[in-house]
Amino acid sequence: MTQKFEMADRFNPSAVEQALYQRWEESGYFKPSENENAPSYCIAIPPPNVTGSLHMGHAFQQTLMDTLIRFNRMEGHNTLWQTGTDHAGIATQMVVERKIAAEEGKTRHDYGREAFINKIWDWKAYSGGTISQQMRRLGNSIDWERERFTMDDGLSNAVKEVFVRLHEEGLIYRGKRLVNWDPKLHTAISDLEVENKESKGSLWHFRYPLANDAKTADGKDYLVVATTRPETMLGDTAVAVHPEDERYQSLIGKTVVLPLANREIPIIADEYVDREFGTGVVKITPAHDFNDYEVGKRHNLPMVNVLTLNANIRDEAEIIGTDGKPLAGYEATIPADYRGLERFAARKKIVADFEALGLLDEIKPHDLKVPYGDRGGVPIEPMLTDQWYVSVKPLADVAIKAVEDGEIQFVPKQYENLYFSWMRDIQDWCISRQLWWGHRIPAWYDAEGNVYVARNEEEVRSKYNLDSAVELKQDEDVLDTWFSSGLWTFSTLGWPEQTKELKMFHPTDVLITGFDIIFFWVARMIMFTMHFVKDENGKPQVPFKTVYVTGLIRDEQGQKMSKSKGNVLDPIDMIDGISLEDLLEKRTGNMMQPQLAEKIAKATRKEFAEGIAAHGTDALRFTLAALASNGRDINWDMKRLEGYRNFCNKLWNASRFVLTNEKLDLSQGEIEFSLADRWIQSEFNRTVETFRSSLSQYRFDLCANAIYEFTWNQFCDWYLELTKPVFANGNAAQIRAASQTLVHVLEKLLRLAHPLIPFITEEIWQKVKGFVGITADSIMLQPFPQVEESGFDPEAEAEIEWLKEVIVAVRNIRAESNIAPSKGLDLLFRNLSAENAKILEKQTALLKAMAKLDNVQVLATNETAPLAVAKLVGNAELLVPMAGFINKEAELARLTKEIEKYQNEVKRIENKLSNEAFVAKAPEAVIAKEREKQAEYQSGLEKIQEQYKAIEAL
């Protein structure tokens, strides 16, 4: 029986991908089942910012996640990929503030809190769909009905629940402590949002007069204090020296007079001081420096805050004790000349006034790192403010033990050390932010300033027995974004309700994320989850069993991708293509630093002179997987993307070749499998084994490589060719066997590759399924190929490998001797082993067909060969008689190269064996193997040299 079949010449991703995805989604293939007893598999996506768009890092991580999800779905697991977006407090608020400033010339204060928040919700509704549409374009098999947003009602309830419970347990408190303060945005920000920039600054050396006629060891009546922050000196409450610094031993415990403020402050000893820095004397300003804050706590120093929230000098200093409460009885007047000055104007005036008083000793150039807010773009100030904190140490201890005990594995393992180093030195976490957009802190204040914490105002009144006449005002602050995203794995599954989803899918299986948020997000998820989610035995649950840490996607030069560098690549542009003009507009439009536009445009024109061609989603996904070597940063490579687009085309063309073959016979009847049929099935079985083993170790690169190698090099380049003689000259049983092998291996190959390249595999599979008698609707729901223990055929593998070497040797002789592929050749074998002679005897017809040979002959031991071109395959010598077609000069040149190759190998092994250290350390078996190789190369060299002499004598 033969089948007529039509198939397009080329695979057109743009015509197929979106329609296929829509069908998958509408058919409900992405949804988990309701079966609570089925083995489950769950991944919670790291939620992207709701106002953003996907970048290459998202595409990279999501490709890996979808590969795992699709694989596990095909394995029969009840699979949930939980998706959603993050409200991203500060980022989203800034986007909308910039938008209303540009379009309406208004600020958020013109709107007021409630109206401005409504404006953000409008923006979220408008832009929030962008990310989910882009994720669909990537082929992500997500149950969209379960999509969550970190400010959904359900998640907001979970946030309030966690806050209230932690407060009731004494683990959340309000206090005045030092935070990173952004004076432009008027909010505390996390360390993650601080960018330390290299700066050419100064180190000022000021003289602080000693009080009460004290003198230094060398007779001076002042100490020289080195500082990079003159503007904060009005808040100094001590100067410090190292306890073992002999220069200042006699002065410890005495005082200096703080210039300009005319206030006595103590000289203290603390090991924090670096004796080599400046003069070895530093000013201590606990209200304006994180290190000084710790020194101040150790020595019970007052904290004198001299800056407003705008970073101007205050009219009156705020004086706070180490307990965070106002401190009475300590005088710290700010001189009138400095009140209201902007911080850097105050710096200039203070330096000038020191100089006028003769107290400026010297100014030295000094390189330093200045902390900037990554969004406000101005230097941040360590600032004493009232904030809410989580006391995380008790939570951290449990989270550390979970990783120590192996309940959570990091891949690669070295990231455990990074996790431990952070967690073992953990500080209380500032969770309040002075923003309008976010989860408002569930705390209320009465007129006297008493604080009441509860889930809502109604609960406050009942919990604290407050009369309805008592006026309450909710805290204005919102929670750090990381607080709500720390609940992500369980809040999205319905917690605090004990839902069936929570029972079925928690703990999740793997988290795929970047190393830069291990502390800010991963660690906090572990702490919160283990504190609040328990199994049926009351044991704390982990949020995930494995953390797979990816590297960054960089550009081709290894630079980090960023808008300011103009080197950002949009994954959708890799899929659909983009013109040079549109790419230039995308990279240079709406820039924060327009002066960089011309430089960026020039670099873009050079790199993408023709714009970017369309490659389709599968090529992008396959490239990302192939580049995913464990934990390393990845340099993006457009050539690899082009290469994998060609790979997709190769798979399409091979499928077309198989399915449109008019001689394909899938009828019932006798079958006779050839050596090639047995070989390709064994090779496929090995590929399945490699894929499964690699995926279990999160080696996505090895998975991609296994599929590429099998598809391109074994199936397309060899097996399809090996079947051509069968279809041309085989009997009915052989043709049936080749036909069955072709379509069944192709169908299984599509299933194997589907998790990585879902669109093209589904499109081809829909055409293949009828050939193999499958009536199912989608490849997604088919079982993933298993390793079949009986499916290995080492004998067939060895025989085909030998035949391939012979065929390649003959083809090389043709190429090197410029012999037309169509010209029939004779092939002689000399020194052929009994084992290979048997293969040759059985497979002569195949060899003749594949290598275009007229005659094949094995020479007797002492038989003289005619003048011939020779190649070695193992120990066997292949000879193609030269009569009538040899080019003497070309053949001598070829043999010279062969002689050099063999001489180099002989020399290399001789050097190895004459190396005493190698011989002393290497096992006997290794040395014996090297000697065996040496003898083989020496023998081969002699044969080629003989051949050279024979041709030279012509």
From Swiss-Prot:
Q: Name one GO cellular component term.
A: cytosol
- Keywords of the record: Aminoacyl-tRNA synthetase, ATP-binding, Coiled coil, Cytoplasm, Ligase, Nucleotide-binding, Protein biosynthesis
Q: EC number(s) of the enzyme?
A: 6.1.1.9
The record's section on Pfam families has: Anticodon_1, tRNA-synt_1, Val_tRNA-synt_C
Coiled-coil region list: 883-953
Q: Where does ATP bind?
A: 563
Q: Which reaction does it catalyse?
A: tRNA(Val) + L-valine + ATP = L-valyl-tRNA(Val) + AMP + diphosphate
Give the record's GO biological process terms: valyl-tRNA aminoacylation
**Location within or outside the cell:** Cytoplasm
Enzyme kind, highest EC tier: ligase
Signal peptide residue numbers: none
GO terms assigned for molecular function: aminoacyl-tRNA deacylase activity; ATP binding; valine-tRNA ligase activity
Motif 'HIGH' region, per the record, lies over 48-58
**Chain span(s) of sequence motif 'KMSKS' region:** 560-564
> What does the record's free text say on domains?
ValRS has two distinct active sites: one for aminoacylation and one for editing. The misactivated threonine is translocated from the active site to the editing site. The C-terminal coiled-coil domain is crucial for aminoacylation activity.
Question: What is the role of this chain?
Answer: Catalyzes the attachment of valine to tRNA(Val). As ValRS can inadvertently accommodate and process structurally similar amino acids such as threonine, to avoid such errors, it has a 'posttransfer' editing activity that hydrolyzes mischarged Thr-tRNA(Val) in a tRNA-dependent manner.
How does the annotation summarize its subunit structure? Monomer.
Q: Which family does it belong to?
A: Belongs to the class-I aminoacyl-tRNA synthetase family. ValS type 1 subfamily.
Stated name of the protein = Valine--tRNA ligase
Q: Which gene encodes it?
A: valS
